């Protein structure tokens, strides 16, 4: 077996955490590795009514038989990492690549203090942009320089590639979404690095020939936090009428809501090299679909929407989320692949 990468197709908050958790429980990876920018993105997973919001530890932590690795491309805030390790009780499984660059208090201050970043761009204020600047200038500290992290250091590419060579399954999760990519997103209203599947693979040290599948996650009603173009954005009143009111996991800011954007989704699927698509929020599209776990039980409206998505992205929709709980999902991978 090789690796599967899961990334966001819009502007983040697509429900990747839920999809990662489901694939982890069903496919049983030996390693769940995290790529992406850093603790500027939050992933939420809900199990048995209990919500977990994580910013550093891979959201697949809910699958207890996998090692949890953070790739060298990810910025690490030691305080956030250690707090999550303690809260989630994953100290025996969580490891950080020794080359990860470190977010220091000065980076957070610079992020929050910059009028350009905080007012114009709408940064999350977590220090990622300024830390990446230091990394590019080759002055950033690395995880190996931080005494508090010494018990958690690893060579992530070595572990991931050895597992793949041994025929074991590795799950790699990204953060944020395609629309926030520094290269392909709605520049300058983007994050501080690329967020596509190729970049996520690079973050954890996996070459393209090792990747078997790329699952791109879209939500029925795309959302974005902060400033920037949003072609299909709907008025807040319209979103409220539909019962869609959401807040960001990290910032607590209200998310902007939009209608499905097939053209953007197609471009995102193309650049990410999607082999499968996951759709979340079908229960927001049609409340009668809440908690449904079989394709046959979806309403005609929901089925028509899924068929439209497949026409737009030209890739099979294999996973359909029908609610926040882990078990509220339709898995069509056996039928469609």
Swiss-Prot record:
The active site is at residues 13, 43. GO terms for molecular function: adenylosuccinate synthase activity; GTP binding; magnesium ion binding. SUPFAM superfamilies: P-loop containing nucleoside triphosphate hydrolases. One of its GO terms (biological process) is 'de novo' AMP biosynthetic process. It is found in: Cytoplasm. Substrate binds at residues 249-255. Keywords: Cytoplasm, GTP-binding, Ligase, Magnesium, Metal-binding, Nucleotide-binding, Purine biosynthesis. Pathway: Purine metabolism; AMP biosynthesis via de novo pathway; AMP from IMP: step 1/2. Its cofactor is Mg(2+). NCBIfam families: PRK04293.1. Homodimer. This is Adenylosuccinate synthetase. The lineage of its organism: Archaea, Methanobacteriati, Methanobacteriota, Archaeoglobi, Archaeoglobales.
